[in-house]
């Protein structure tokens, strides 16, 4: 039997999503909890692996199991065995053809910026703090230059293992609510550090340090060293994964939940 789960987590105290030896990971904690409920070893496949300090409100995973359990076992039962900063949000038994990663047609991230001279207290692990004047309208205008299929060599990590630097961005929106700026970006897939590198570049434009046309220059250069510094991890959320309608997966309100959808 193949089971899909919707997962939410605060990634601030984990060394990323992927299971690793000798360090705590979101995948490791989830598999441990699932294995207790299934009474057999469980390995999960995810829609997108997030880095150290990055959060997820719309992560999707699947796993195969011989265990027959009620839905409440895979939700309430697993949540009882998870740390407080990881939670199962929904469950669905799916066809064998479903794959959390390869069936996905798009991923959506939101990057939350706290734009204020003084650092935050309560939300310090859920937002990235940037001081000074930031023009979100300039950021939004520049962000439109990323839309479409491009070679994102200038915006991927040097250690990125993807065989191709080409990705297609479907839409990018930059909005402000008071002190909070949200960069909302959807694409078919993302390269390692791609969202944070894009945000770093947009911040330089929003601060007035570069013109919006800098985006086109960086895309053409295909050189990571010419782009802006990588933005902090703690403001980044994987908020949604898109799948073909016939899988009929549950849809929740987009996060993070302290922001209006």
From Swiss-Prot:
Could you confirm whether the keyword Protein transport appears in this record?
no
Question: Which UniProt keyword terms apply here?
Answer: Isomerase, tRNA processing
Q: Which reaction does it catalyse?
A: uridine(38/39/40) in tRNA = pseudouridine(38/39/40) in tRNA
Q: What is its EC number?
A: 5.4.99.12
Q: Which GO terms describe its biological process?
A: tRNA pseudouridine synthesis
Q: Where does substrate bind?
A: 109
Please list the GO terms describing molecular function: RNA binding; tRNA pseudouridine(38-40) synthase activity
- Quote any Pfam family the record assigns: PseudoU_synth_1
Q: Does the keyword Isomerase apply?
A: yes
Q: What InterPro entries does the record point to? A: PsdUridine_synth_cat_dom_sf, PsdUridine_synth_TruA, PsdUridine_synth_TruA_a/b_dom, PsdUridine_synth_TruA_C, TruA/RsuA/RluB/E/F_N
> What are the catalytic residues?
51 (nucleophile)
Could you tell me what this protein does?
A: Formation of pseudouridine at positions 38, 39 and 40 in the anticodon stem and loop of transfer RNAs.
Self-association and partners? Homodimer.
Q: Which family does it belong to?
A: Belongs to the tRNA pseudouridine synthase TruA family.
What's the protein called, per UniProt? tRNA pseudouridine synthase A
From what organism does this protein derive? Shewanella piezotolerans (strain WP3 / JCM 13877)
